[in-house]
Amino acid sequence: MTLYKLVVLGDGGVGKTALTIQLCLNHFVETYDPTIEDSYRKQVVIDQQSCMLEVLDTAGQEEYTALRDQWIRDGEGFVLVYSITSRASFTRIQKFYNQIKMVKESAHSGSPSGASYLGSPMNAPSGPPLPVPVMLVGNKSDKAVERAVSAQEGQALAKDLGCEFVEASAKNCINVEKAFYDVVRMLRQQRQQQQGGRAQDRRPTGLGPMRDRDAGPEYPKTFRPDRARHRGGIKCVIL
């Protein structure tokens, strides 16, 4: 079964954990408990195709910037979250996006600091770098009376960044699946394009025999080698 690694990024308190748990465990978490790193797995069917999602819920605090580089290196697609009730969290989205771009470009250029796992479609050994699949999510759309960021501003930022946009409510389970599933759709399209390119050009790469991406690339068992700071381990939900 094909595995997709998604990473959720954004300021603390914007609802990253609430969105992730609503997607994977189908319930809403009322209490805010700052996350360092939690990983969840869920088997889903998207457009009549079964797949496994591995969703990494990350810390938004500034002191975890170094860890964030590792999370980004290991991720394939990204869900960037801000709260519509917080202009500061919206302003910080550009910083998170720039960090994604910097880390992925470093990985593609072959920098040791940007090395990622083998088989990542985002880090092909040759050719131009592929666009990084990103979904911008304005969470807490249920708090309309507290709105500090308009939907039009969110759409404009997404256009500037070249990514998709949706407003969502983890509390009311509105557009939660769309936020994650659309990233998977982008990843699928990229993998299909890469498979088509390899069918036309099968030159040796020095990395061993060609493999079918959708047959299951080789992934590490964890997002990062240091598990000491991992609070909850991998949560696995099989539907």
Curated annotation (Swiss-Prot):
Gene3D superfamilies: P-loop containing nucleotide triphosphate hydrolases (3.40.50.300). One of its GO terms (molecular function) is GTPase activity. GTP binds at residues 13-18, 29-35, 59-60, 139-142, 169-171. Pfam families: Ras. Keywords: GTP-binding, Hydrolase, Nucleotide-binding, Virulence. Residues 191-227 are annotated as: Disordered. Disruption phenotype: Causes decreased germination and growth rates on solid media but has no effect on total biomass accumulation. Leads to irregular hyphal morphology characterized by increased branching. Also leads to decreased virulence. It is an enzyme of class 3 (hydrolase). One of its GO terms (cellular component) is plasma membrane. Residues 199-226 have a biased composition (Basic and acidic residues). Induction: Expression is regulated by the cell wall integrity pathway transcription factor rlmA that binds the 5'-YTAWWWWTAR-3' motif at the rasB promoter. PROSITE patterns: RAS. Its EC number is 3.6.5.2. A motif (Effector region) lies at residues 32-40. InterPro entries: P-loop_NTPase (IPR027417), Small_GTP-bd (IPR005225), Small_GTPase (IPR001806), Small_GTPase_Ras-type (IPR020849). It catalyses: GTP + H2O = GDP + phosphate + H(+). Signal peptide: none annotated. GO terms for biological process: hyphal growth; signal transduction. Belongs to the small GTPase superfamily. Ras family. The conserved rasB internal amino acid insertion (residues 109 to 131) is required for the function. Ras-like protein involved in the activation of Ras protein signal transduction. Ras proteins bind GDP/GTP and possess intrinsic GTPase activity. Plays a role in hyphal morphology and conidiophore development. Required for full virulence. Interacts with mpkA. This is Ras-like protein B. The gene is rasB.
